[in-house]
Amino acid sequence: MKFSPLVDELIQSLRCLPGVGPKSAQRMAFQLLERDRKAGAKLADSLAKAMSEVGHCQSCRTFTEETYCPICVSTKRGHSEVICVVETPADVLAIEAGGHFSGRYFVLLGHLSPLDGVGPDELGLDLLEQHLATGDVSELILATNPTVEGDATAHYIADMAKRHQLTVSRIAHGVPVGGELEYVDSTTLALSFNGRLPM
């Protein structure tokens, strides 16, 4: 069934979000139009404002409205000579929520994927290399995803960092806390055995 052109346009627009299919988009559109027009107007305003004002930090490439993000300009971060390399701004939020890292970040905005036309230039690795060349960085922590592309990206960056005589490490992978072994896949289990620690 066809709705009015504006309703159809709203439904189609909502489908651009990850995990939102036609039925979910229709439910969202109807919720906003039927029950919460004020929230819909606020959503539209926030979205328009974010799209026009949010860009990327010129140092780490995460999202910010300023030239540099709050993390990069903070004088309270304890290990500013340590850079954690992540794939997305969402990864920065996840690590910050844990509260166990007090260094700086570099956001790749993706991973190496030659088949998709994503090479080192698209990931801003020239900017990362500039950071490494300053001599202000002592360690690079690679926190790319444990995928084929994430592994390839980590190896590429590790080789680049070693040319600058930096300490390079990669975050550990293995059995999650609270996980049960019978539900863990064989690759994760192998990583857990290979990365075991003495007690």
UniProtKB/Swiss-Prot annotation:
Every copy of the Toprim domain together lies at: 81-176
Q: Which residues form a coiled coil?
A: none
Q: Name one GO molecular function term.
A: zinc ion binding
Q: Which Pfam families match?
A: RecR_C, RecR_HhH, RecR_ZnF, Toprim_4
UniProt GO BP: DNA recombination; DNA repair
Is DNA damage a UniProt keyword of this protein?
yes
State the InterPro entries in the record.
DNA_Rcmb_RecR (IPR000093), Rcmb_RecR (IPR023627), Rcmb_RecR_Znf (IPR015967), TOPRIM_dom (IPR006171), TOPRIM_RecR (IPR034137)
- Keyword GTP-binding applies: no
**Entry-linked PROSITE patterns:** TOPRIM (PS50880)
What are the protein's UniProt keywords? DNA damage, DNA recombination, DNA repair, Metal-binding, Zinc, Zinc-finger
Chain intervals annotated as zinc finger (C4-type): 57-72
Its family remark reads: Belongs to the RecR family.
Instruction: Give the matching HAMAP family.
Output: RecR
- Give a short account of what the protein does: May play a role in DNA repair. It seems to be involved in an RecBC-independent recombinational process of DNA repair. It may act with RecF and RecO.
Could you tell me what this protein is called? Recombination protein RecR
Source organism per entry reads Shewanella pealeana (strain ATCC 700345 / ANG-SQ1)
Q: Which gene encodes it?
A: recR
